[in-house]
């Protein structure tokens, strides 16, 4: 039995979608285990170019089951758009399954998210997709789940209980309110759309484990956005770490046989929060591109330009400590082809002392990044399919990352497509 987890080792946007698309070709079940449609996984393969927000990137292996997992909050309307994107490319979604326990992100969740951001009281630059309110609803047990869609009487009773408080919040902002009949109609329509896809995920996963099937878990965002261990409060509302793959799916933690951490060859971040290695001059900013190319540094969901900086080794070490990476995938090495020299942040300095542990948010905003400088390679790595064929300075850069983090780099991305990966 093989149970592999792929997670982001930075702040998201590392290239997880591409790596899942590649690695999922050898798996029987691919599970998105947390998050919602607030971030996207970009995939480029023989079927076309796709920006996936909810559906696991394993959907492109038509012989595997792709599961929208229990730990997710799912906007049914956005899910339908993605399904149409897949079928329009000539693929089937018959292998797409949805956990009965996956929470449904309702229209009022999005309303509340946007209203909270607009109020300016505690704006952290969210995507306004309703993720925070949906996870809050899960914690307060006011949400409904996909399994509930089959029970109209229960839904009516549930909304009669919870809707007054929700409408009270909406009225505070002067926003439009909802009726019970309106929400029940939404649910009736969603049930017609998804009835054949809804499954008992717990039983499905355990049955496949008993059959020694290969299972791949796909995380969203990255460890630095973890609600508990990330750069709080500039975080998401779930746990995009390897351990949560087991927690949200109901499998023993020891069932996980390998963890792959995905990182970019540099650093990026969308939204607010401390960013010790951020660079504002043209050297790094030129890597962003214009937004016209699929691999330019703009958010897959929001289209916002990403903040950019040098590779941050303290972040990768921290991510490794939390997740226990067996291997790393370093993506977008090709984006650095034009740089004459490359810096790596090896440590943080705070009040004239080198920090030995990863700091809390307040201190992180005050640290000074300590760098070492390596020569660039100033030639293209696009089209290279062997580590030995990389420029010497590019190989040295990868080896230095391995030395500093203490994890072998198995995968190296040198372009946006599934085929643009060197496997060592």
From Swiss-Prot:
Residues noted as binding Mg(2+) in the record, renumbered to the chain: 13, 40
Cofactor(s) the protein requires to work: Mg(2+)
GO annotations of cellular component type: cytoplasm
GO molecular function, one term: GTP binding
CDD domains: AdSS (cd03108)
Organism: Methanosarcina acetivorans (strain ATCC 35395 / DSM 2834 / JCM 12185 / C2A)
Top-level lineage group: Archaea
Entry EC no(s): 6.3.4.4
Active site: 13, 41
A GO biological process held by the record: IMP metabolic process
Protein function: Plays an important role in the de novo pathway of purine nucleotide biosynthesis. Catalyzes the first committed step in the biosynthesis of AMP from IMP.
A Pfam family annotated for this UniProt entry: Adenylsucc_synt
Cofactor note: Binds 1 Mg(2+) ion per subunit.
Catalytic reaction list: IMP + L-aspartate + GTP = N(6)-(1,2-dicarboxyethyl)-AMP + GDP + phosphate + 2 H(+)
Pathway: Purine metabolism; AMP biosynthesis via de novo pathway; AMP from IMP: step 1/2
Quaternary context: Homodimer.
Residues that hold GTP according to the record: 12-18, 40-42, 306, 332-334, 413-415
Keyword set, alphabetical order: Cytoplasm, GTP-binding, Ligase, Magnesium, Metal-binding, Nucleotide-binding, Purine biosynthesis
Binding positions for substrate per the UniProt entry: 300-306
Compartment list: Cytoplasm
Enzyme superclass (EC): ligase
Record family assignment: Belongs to the adenylosuccinate synthetase family.
Signal peptide: none
Entry protein name: Adenylosuccinate synthetase 1
Alphabetical list of InterPro entries matching this protein: Adenylosuccin_syn_GTP-bd, Adenylosuccinate_synth_dom1, Adenylosuccinate_synth_dom2, Adenylosuccinate_synth_dom3, Adenylosuccinate_synthetase, P-loop_NTPase
């Amino acid at each position: 039995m093989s149970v592999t987890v792929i997670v982001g080792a930075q702040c998201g946007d590392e290239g997880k979608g591409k790596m899942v698309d590649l690695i999922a070709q050898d798996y029987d079940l691919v599970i998105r285990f947390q998050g919602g449609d607030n971030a996207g996984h970009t995939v480029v393969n023989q079927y076309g170019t796709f920006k996936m927000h909810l559906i696991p990137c394993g959907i492109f292996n038509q012989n595997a089951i792709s599961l929208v997992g229990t730990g997710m909050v799912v906007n049914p309307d956005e899910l339908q758009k993605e399904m149409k994107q897949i079928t329009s490319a000539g693929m089937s979604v018959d292998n797409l399954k949805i956990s009965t326990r996956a929470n449904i992100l309702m229209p009022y969740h999005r309303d509340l998210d946007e209203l909270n951001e607009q109020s300016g009281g505690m704006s952290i630059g969210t995507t306004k997709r309703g993720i925070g309110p949906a996870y809050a609803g899960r914690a307060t047990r006011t949400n409904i789940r996909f399994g509930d869609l089959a029970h109209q009487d229960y839904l009516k009773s549930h909304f009669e209980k919870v809707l007054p408080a929700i409408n009270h919040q909406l009225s505070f902002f002067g926003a439009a309110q909802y009726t019970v009949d309106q929400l029940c109609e939404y649910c009736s329509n969603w049930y017609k759309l998804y009835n054949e896809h809804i499954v008992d995920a717990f039983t499905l996963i355990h049955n496949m484990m008993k059959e020694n099937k290969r299972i791949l878990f796909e995380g969203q965002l990255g460890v630095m956005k973890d609600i508990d261990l990330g750069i709080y409060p500039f975080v998401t509302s779930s746990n995009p770490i390897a351990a949560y793959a087991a927690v949200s799916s109901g499998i023993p933690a020891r069932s996980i046989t390998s963890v792959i951490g995905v990182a970019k060859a540099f650093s990026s971040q969308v939204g607010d929060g401390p960013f010790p290695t951020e660079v504002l001059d043209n050297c790094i900013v030129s890597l962003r591109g214009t937004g016209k190319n699929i691999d330019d540094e703009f958010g897959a969901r929001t289209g916002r330009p990403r903040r950019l900086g040098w590779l941050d080794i303290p972040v990768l070490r921290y991510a490794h400590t939390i997740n226990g990476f067996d291997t790393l995938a370093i993506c977008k090495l090709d984006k650095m082809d034009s740089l004459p020299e490359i810096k790596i942040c090896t440590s943080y300095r705070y009040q004239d002392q080198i920090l030995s542990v990863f700091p809390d948010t307040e201190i992180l905003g005050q640290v000074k990044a300590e760098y070492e400088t390596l020569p660039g390679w100033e030639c293209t790595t696009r089209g290279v399919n062997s580590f030995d064929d990389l420029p010497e300075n590019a190989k040295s850069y990868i080896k230095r990352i391995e030395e500093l983090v203490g994890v072998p780099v198995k995968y190296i991305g040198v372009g946006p497509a599934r085929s643009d990966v060197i496997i060592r």
